[in-house]
Amino acid sequence: MATMMSMSSFAGAAVVPRSSASSFGARSLPALGRRALVVRAQTEGPSAPPPNKPKASTSIWDEMAFSGPAPERINGRLAMVGFVTALAVEAGRGDGLLSQLGSGTGQAWFAYTVAVLSMASLVPLLQGESAEGRAGAIMNANAELWNGRFAMLGLVALAATEIITGAPFINV
């Protein structure tokens, strides 16, 4: 309340004529014919648009570089398909991972899968898309990387199990 009184007395002294302002002990401004508040504002002129970010290089050598986005994603995708396929064949026929790789049919399917998934992974990257930009709510780019890493470890574990025990992981 005291703050409001002191502010109103200060404001009153600024607009009250000189003779009545002397009781407040403050200097007053000359009385104006009309009491209006003038606010001057200036808008900023049209500014230049922000500079565009340089477009990411879409060279195949940049994408396939050691620290590029493609190698780990492609290998992870191949490992995910390979791990599930190896387990399905082990469960269906009883063939272990190493015996699957030794057969001519297994090598043909491996080569075909590598070619198709590599091209399917490279085409969007070469068009300038990123895995982070295509991420959804459940399956994001980070989850894909971790699933691929675990699938790679799973393939190594399947091979190690077959080498150590002499039998496939899933015995039918």
UniProtKB/Swiss-Prot annotation:
Keyword vocabulary terms for this entry: Chloroplast, Membrane, Plastid, Transit peptide, Transmembrane, Transmembrane helix
Annotated compartments: Plastid, Chloroplast membrane
Record's bilayer topology term: Multi-pass membrane protein
Residue ranges of the TM segments: 106-126, 150-170
Stored Pfam families: Chloroa_b-bind (PF00504)
Transit peptide limits: 1-38
Origin: domain of life: Eukaryota
Conditions for induction: By light.
GO cellular component, as recorded: chloroplast membrane
Family that this chain belongs to: Belongs to the ELIP/psbS family.
Function: Probably involved in the integration of pigments into the mature pigment-protein complexes.
Protein name as it appears in the record: Low molecular mass early light-inducible protein HV90, chloroplastic
